[in-house]
Amino acid sequence: MVSLQFLGTGGARWVVAKQIRSSAGFWIRADGTNLHIDPGPGALVRALAQLPPCDPATLDAIVLSHKHLDHAGDVNVMIEAMCQGGWRPRGALCAPRDALDESMQPVVFPYARRFVPREWIVGADESPFEVGSVTITASPRLRHPVETYGLHFRAGGATVSYIPCTRYFDGIVDDYRARAPAVLVINVLRYRDSMDVDHLTYDDARRLIEGIRPGAAIMSHFGTRMLERDPKRLAYELEDATGIKTFAAYDGWTYDVV
């Protein structure tokens, strides 16, 4: 059994600052293995507020796609919770080098890093990383101001692929299509790119879904303009346009992959 639980589906400064949507990231559960992806601000509180609670002490890995605040704000407290205050070192930490290296303004505190016995530097090691029943691989570096990598989680005979924050470029389609994802999670921050920033838009999401052809697509990490236009309605429109089952994630939603 593989499932995704979205603790938070908000992105961008205003949505995060006002917590219009939570910025807590999402969990992957796969045959007894638990991973927390991009634990932004509020991740610990949101995890424990779920019914039933998502217990950080059951986590096998914490994974960062990149070090920006809305993706990594709660990484240290989640490490402490996973390792029970450091008294029970366990699990794995997966993050780009600039999120960890003390010479590169890291977001993971050195003392918290010592609690975790296994570490995978995303983007530096091209070999797959095994965490329980899950195999994690990374895509080549995406186009964002800090080190950012797409991630692929293989478990139960299915692949969950994640496109975090990036500017659109054609290489994304080729790389992700080769992974044949059962589910594609896309961070769709903006409706239109009126500010020329390194984030995906609604139109980019359509191009990605049409090109990659996943089994299903899930939009998340919404900014204010996406929320104003009703992500659920936009997901229906994308499904009609692409022929691919498309969902707009919401806080607390669980999706069963297999």
Task: Name each model-derived stretch.
Residues 14, 45, 72, 103, ...:
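Glycine/Thr-rich phosphate-binding loops of Rossmann-like dinucleotide-binding domains
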Residues 2-51, 148-165, 183:
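Conserved beta-strand hairpin/beta-sheet module of binuclear metal-dependent hydrolase folds
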Residues 48-54, 128-132, 173-178:
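Short amphipathic alpha-helix with an adjacent loop that forms part of the alpha/beta core around
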Residues 36-40, 59-70, 161-166, 184-188, ...:
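Active-site neighborhood of phospho(di)ester-bond hydrolases with catalytic His/Asp-centered motifs
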Residues 42-92, 180-183:
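Active-site metal-binding motif and surrounding structural segment of the metallo-beta-lactamase
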Residues 168-254:
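Cap/insert and terminal regions of metallo-dependent hydrolase folds
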Residues 88-148, 155-156, 249-252:
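Metallo-beta-lactamase
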